Amino acid sequence: MLKSRKLFPTALLTLLVAAFSLPAPALANHTQATYFEATPLLLSSTTRAATIAQLQRLGVRALRVELSWHDVAPGSNSATKPAFDATDPNAYGWGAYDAIVTEAARLHWKVLLTVTSPAPRWATSNKKAPYVTRPDPKDFQEFMTAVGRHYGAGVTYSIWNEANHPAFLMPQWNSNGTPASPRIYRGLYQAGYTGLQAAISSPTVLFGETAPTGYSKVNVHREHSRALLHDVAPLAFLREALCLNSHYRKSGSCSLLPMSGYAHHAYTIAAGPHYVDPNRDDVAIGTLSRLSNALGKAAAAHAIPANLPIWLTEFGVQSKPNRFLGVSVAQQAEFDAIAEQIAWSNPRVVAFSQYLLRDDPVGGAPGASVHGGTVGFQTGLEYVNGKPKPLYASWPVPLTATKSHGGFSLWGYVRNATGPTTVTVLVRLKGSHSYRTLKTVTTNSLGYWTLGTSARGQFFRVRWTSPEGVRYEGPPIK
């Protein structure tokens, strides 16, 4: 995408002093829960308490946790399934997952539990690492009954992480070049949903959890076996999993799948949050309308419930030192806020999630995990050494600024707000080294606010002081 529009300085200082205001744009008519995923730090007993304290200061009230089937299952590295009642939660070693869910309950935080691969070795078709090949639906159904009995109706469930990516589910493609993973996933989802129903009468379950990019078709003749390692584009995956053809018409006798929402990971590239991928089956944050339209067509075909909400359950902006997808840390803070505003502006989106508090170590090139390597994500609020990035200061009080009607439209959010509160908006002119108060604005009951202004500052930032006296000040936004 193009970089964020550069804001031009005002020609008259009186505009700054008077802070002439334009009518504020209307707020979107829906709420948007914000989830945070910091599973590696939360799973460790040595970092859990400090991480929870950090998340509280940042304004977190909901967690996404990826629950690995392999981590908790008995005999998970054995080729032979042990003799045990797979529907009995007492047969599993829930370990640190229980500690996370218990702490979240104490804090009255919501929990989204994504149950995912790797599977136990004995539950896969080839019994080979990384244990993601054709997991057995019957085994998964029994496991999900145990999961539901253990964690109950107090959490939201999501079935499988990025099933359209070969690092999490194999095979992605059949030897003839047709997609394989969508129908495998459909079987796993149906089994998992049935398993949860045996434990919970009306479970809240998300479908999809799709990665943002992939291939709509592959050329096995040209690429041979390499073609089968490509990920499946999310909308191509959606259609095949729902038994729809390219025109979103039912193909076959598949019934409607029950679900509470569609989960997606709308990552974008270094071009920024408004980037439009030329593959129309890809869905990044800048092309959310593609997913909205696809879900509408799928509902019209009676493949899914009508008016299905979108959950953006994993998102982050890569920063340097990621040499493939990273932007500067200043741009990371700006792009992250823009992406959240895009999600907030879409009335179908009910959840947005930040992936990583602390960066991973720098790993291999994108796709390295398919070949047994590691991929480091630099989407965190902190560097790998724990030093904060600008995003750490901006995430609790995100701010965007865009040209609008002869002036600028500002949008912001105070995550720690528990009701209407006041925020100080600051502006800095070109050539100036200091900020001045533009206006004090009042948020709505959820903490969101907007402001239209004719004051053309070069940089804007916000300042908010909590009722406990903790001061939050975001970084400069161009």
Where are these regions (language model features)?
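C-terminal segment of classical bacterial N-terminal signal peptides
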Residues: 18-26
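Conserved, mostly hydrophobic/aromatic
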Residues: 36, 63, 104, 147, ...
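Short strand-edge motifs at loop-to-beta-strand transitions and within beta-strands
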Residues: 447-451
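Substrate-binding cleft and catalytic face of glycoside hydrolase catalytic domains
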Residues: 58-227, 269
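Boundary/entry segment of secreted carbohydrate-active catalytic domains
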Residues: 27-62, 66-68
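Noncatalytic carbohydrate-binding groove/subsite architecture in carbohydrate-active enzymes
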Residues: 45-49, 141, 177-330
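Aromatic-rich peripheral "rim/lid" segments of glycoside hydrolase catalytic domains that contact
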Residues: 79, 163, 168, 174-179, ...
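Bacterial N-terminal signal peptides that target proteins for export
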Residues: 1-12
